[in-house]
Amino acid sequence: MSSSDIFDVLNIRPKSSSPDAEAQTPTPSSGTVKHNKPQVTGIQRELYSLLGDNTPTVPIKQGNKFKDSLNSNIKPSPWSFVEFEANSHLKLRHWVKGSKELVGATVEPSSFAKFNQHLTIPSFDEQEFQQFMNGNNSEWKYGEVQYLFDLCRNYDMKWFVIADRFNYNGTERKLDDLKEMFYTVCQWYFLYKDPDNPLISQLNFPKEKELERKKYLERLLKRTAAEIAEEEALIIESRKFEMAAKKTLQEREALLQLLDHPHSDKPISQFLTSQGMSQLYANLLNDKNRKRKPDSNTPENPWMKQQQQFAQQRQQIQHQQQFKQGQIIQQQQQQQQQQQQQQQQKQQKQQKPQSDQITSKDQQPSENIEVKTEGQRLNKKQKIELQNALRRKQDSEYAEHLLEKFTLEERKALGVIAHGEKLAPGVYLRSSKISTYKPAVQNKIVATLQELGLPVRPAMPSLEVVQEHEKLLKKIATLLELKKQVDKLTAEKQIVK
């Protein structure tokens, strides 16, 4: 198969090398520069020869992108400048589509007149006013009431505008007085005209409640920032109590469900044998080890959340204090190293050639080392004591921070105490923590208590009783010590005599 056959199959026309074709090709002008194209050989030549006209897959509509010219044959529609009636005493003009013949010469109302709605306020004359009022209000006369009703019609019951514009023969009326008079007159009017009207019950205006509401609002607006914060804190506390009450109710219901278990109808004879007892024990053990789903409806405990926040704050304070302690320890170590270097420099300057001095110098370093080791030990002890003191201080500050919102009376009522020192783990009796003295002093204290008619240990060792008992023991011990010193001085005085 030749190349011409391939061209015929692929519908490709080969390049003709006839002289007629060469003659038809345009000759370049003298001014243009002829660029020789590189000759393509091999596969590239075959690929170039396969290229033909690429037809687009999607038809492209090549239309004119400019706007069409205006059609001047269409006749423009006429517009006319006509009058319209805005209200009964005002006429304006506007443009309307259409000729004057079509629109007409009559003045039409505004298209927005349908939105101009007014309230239906009752109207009456002086005779009707005297009949339905029947002398119920002697302060307001008919002229002033009619003036008020006219203002209400003109300003659509905008009471602040009405109170601002009200000026009847120089009389001053407050906004609440105007409201009260308007609603009372309307109520008496409907009672006179239509006693069965359902609007009568809604026309009652409580003036005293309105004044009280405004005073309360003024007090709210005049609150200080401290009062607002106090109210917010009280609201938060009340919500916490509500959450705690809900939780206690849920726990109480759970306990009642546990206590009020359903009675089984099965006989107990099957559990009287050893096999039945072992089966019952296995069932109870499986029930105990079974994982129960946590109750998702239980509310979050606000006290636990607050304690977690306090614990986080406490950890931050501890980290800061530990960082400060580390800086202080580093400074102390640097000062000690500087002192040691200064001592070594002084010792090197004071060297002498004598043998005694040499021996003494040989002994000095060992002594210095011993002194340094003792100093280092003392420093370590001091560091440990300082750390313990700081920890106790942090614990006491944390406890006081937790209880700062409780007063002394509330602490006493709840029995809450902030211990400054670390307590021993486990349960103990408060009476066992009463301080004891030496046997000789203890016997004298017991004798003194018996003389006073008091027991050695309190019968009801509450917190306050134990504190007062401790104070009493300390005072008795100091008095016994003073008595001992007085007896000693009197004996010496008698010997001198």
UniProtKB/Swiss-Prot annotation:
Q: What is the protein's known function?
A: Component of the SWR1 complex which mediates the ATP-dependent exchange of histone H2A for the H2A variant HZT1 leading to transcriptional regulation of selected genes by chromatin remodeling. Component of the NuA4 histone acetyltransferase complex which is involved in transcriptional activation of selected genes principally by acetylation of nucleosomal histone H4 and H2A. The NuA4 complex is also involved in DNA repair.
Region described as Disordered: spans on this chain: 1-38, 286-317, 344-377
One Pfam family from the UniProt entry?
SANT_DAMP1_like
Q: Where in the sequence does UniProt note compositional bias of the Low complexity kind?
A: 306-317, 344-358
Its gene?
Answer: SWC4
Name by which UniProt lists this protein: SWR1-complex protein 4
Q: What is its main location?
A: nucleus
Name the family: Belongs to the SWC4 family.
Instruction: Quote one Gene Ontology molecular function term.
Output: transcription corepressor activity
**Biological process GO annotation list?**
chromatin remodeling; DNA repair; negative regulation of transcription by RNA polymerase II
Query: Where's it found, cell-wise?
Result: Nucleus
What disulfide bonds does the UniProt entry report for this chain? none
> Which top-rank group of organisms is this from?
Eukaryota
Q: From which source organism is this entry?
A: Kluyveromyces lactis (strain ATCC 8585 / CBS 2359 / DSM 70799 / NBRC 1267 / NRRL Y-1140 / WM37)
- Can you name a GO cellular component term? NuA4 histone acetyltransferase complex
Self-association state and partner proteins as the record states: Component of the SWR1 chromatin-remodeling complex and of the NuA4 histone acetyltransferase complex.
